[in-house]
Amino acid sequence: MIRGFHKDKLQYSFMLHHPALLRFIKDFNSGRYFEAHEHLEEALDEVEEIPAAWELSIGLIQIAVGYHKCASGYPGGEKMLGLGLAKVSSLPNVCNGVRLEELRQRLREDLADMQGVKGRLQKDPPRITLTK
């Protein structure tokens, strides 16, 4: 039990509208990938007992770190993007309110052409959207 709810019922909705997730998305969508990942890192203790929320959080953290590395020219961006994609690939298309299919498609495109990622991040940065 977590906060009076059975954790199976929270599996795919625990992070829905969670303040850390909302701050993550705001910073991620603004291209502040490093800042974005910090918001979810702060909330990890809250989700460690909820597998889908944990997988989503870790995957999004890895994706944000990967894009931060790519945008900044640091090594390791491709590896982090790949790890993040692998983590969110097992989740449903909508998990905890996050629409994942568009993000997964963007990650696949970026991983297929790592040479152009930095330019794409400037011209057409990835976006994370929520369900209503």
Regions found by a protein language model. Name each.
Residues 26-27, 61, 68:
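Residue-level signature for tetratricopeptide repeat
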Residues 1-49, 83-132:
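N-terminal alpha-helical interaction modules that lie
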Residues 68-70, 114:
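TPR/TPR-like alpha-solenoid repeats
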Residues 20, 55, 60-62:
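TPR repeat positional signature
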Residues 32, 73-74:
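Residues in the short coil linking paired helices within alpha-helical repeat scaffolds
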Residues 63, 70, 77-80, 84:
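Short secondary-structure subsegments characteristic of cysteine-rich extracellular domains
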Residues 49-56, 74, 97:
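Short, surface-exposed loop/turn segments at secondary-structure junctions
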